[in-house]
Amino acid sequence: LIIIEAMIPFFVSFEGRKPKVRDIVILAVMCALGGTGRAAFFMLPNFSPTMAIVIISGVAFGCEGGFVVGAMSMFVSNFLMGQGPWTPWQMFAMGLVGFMAGLFFSKSGVRTKNTTKLGLCIFGALICILIYGGIMNPASVIIWQPAVNRSMIIASYVTGFPFDVVHGTATVIFLWLLARPFLEKLDRVRIKYGVL
């Protein structure tokens, strides 16, 4: 319940911007890409383009847009992967990834020229392991254990680290391949149609 309540300010902030239909449509497309990207790679645990798409969305559309794409991508993809008590945690963690991408990289009108592929890849790997893994690893203990202690939390970080590395590697690969073409197209759409 606390995680769900923690997401409310982000969604209220987005709604406070009074988004137009065209803003919502482009964010919905990015959410659909994130959700289907996760479903398309379901046979490879933790290897999907979802985090890369969320980071790209945060860079292209700012903090609030990145949060919305991250949170909704996890919500939508969990209709295929399975909804459960982990869904709000995943939504919050991935939304935070999109928010932080917007915070670190969206400083100018044309964001493509100021964002390097290498910088995005390093950011993607670190945020995947430190933020997403840092939230989801202990969440696996908090969700299922009635009495949580420090050794359980440490064990969740240790056992989750290899999966975080795989997830971070996938994020780096997909950012390396997709960041530049996606950001160029999204900047073009943003400038031409006045999106976000």
Regions found by a protein language model. Give the residues of each.
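Short, mixed-charge, low-aromatic patches
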Residues: M7-F14, I53-G58, Y132-N137
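Membrane-embedded alpha-helical hairpins and interfacial helices in multi-pass inner-membrane proteins
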Residues: L1, M43, S48, Q83-W89, ...
